[in-house]
């Protein structure tokens, strides 16, 4: 079946937005004339990132529940009702063959209204432990595409398609790029490289741990390619400059992630869904430090899925300052463990995730509106 009109809803974080855009790109690759409309949440990241990727987006006034008693919480029931009504209007006006939910605040009202209007829905779950919205909406979905195996304990078995997370292809294309990467980042080809990545904003714990262990890393004749994030760059830059450590290569943000992965001997990362999916495709020995500041503690669950299969090492957030650098240096020296981790993490990689998800979309899409 030809896809002509599709709504994709959700967002809030890059972990929701980037897979959504990857799915949209694959739909457009196969069906260039398909009209795709995104539905996001007011004031969230998707309202900026989606138009930048070339797609139209409409906003719902939806928000999450705050743990503290606030005026915002008192307004929440009214915002939910208004978001449901607005989502209904958007769907009736756009007349999609299919609504895809990727998680995040906006996906709840949009998928709920699509189900009530008889529009097929597909849920794309990025994590090994689903969010509450996806679990609530799963029974009414026509299909659920998961990033991890063994998700039957959360979703109806007959609806599950184990596709993996769609990632940007250029991010994981690393073969034959090590020499180019060394030149690009001005690294020493004779030194082992530790890549540290904590997201575009940065990860406070990772930054503190690397800052604490900079001298030890330098003395060990190891170089560090370090993405510290926008929020921490000025403070970390002062620390690096003050110590005059030539082996510490600090970046606010790395936009050439293919080159960063290509030159890395060991990777230190948070355990967000998309980071884990990218790491599973590049096959680098990895130390994961899950963020404790996420819903359902899903980063720890993502990490443990790999750790239980000897595909990654876990360092807990509260232990990172004292343990992380030592763990990384020990891993660099352990050739057999590096090989084992690199080999095992590849078994979680799904190169054709976007293509498989679009195949499922085609199989469940509505032929036409009456």
Go through the PLM ranges and name each one:
Residues 350-370:
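C-terminal alpha-helical cap of glycosyltransferases
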Residues 44-45, 49, 53, 176-183, ...:
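Donor-nucleotide binding loops and adjacent catalytic segments primarily
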Residues 96-98, 262-277, 284-285:
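Acidic donor-binding loop of glycosyltransferase active sites
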Residues 55, 119-120, 265-266, 283-291, ...:
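Structural loop-to-beta junction motif characteristic of Rossmann-like glycosyltransferase folds
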Residues 3-11, 30-79, 84, 232, ...:
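Conserved nucleotide-sugar phosphate-binding/catalytic loop shared by glycosyltransferases and other
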Residues 44-48, 98-117:
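An aromatic- and histidine-rich active-site surface loop
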Residues 56, 115-178, 187:
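Active-site-proximal region of nucleotide-activated glycan assembly enzymes
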Residues 337-351:
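A short, well-ordered alpha-helix in the C-terminal region of glycosyltransferases
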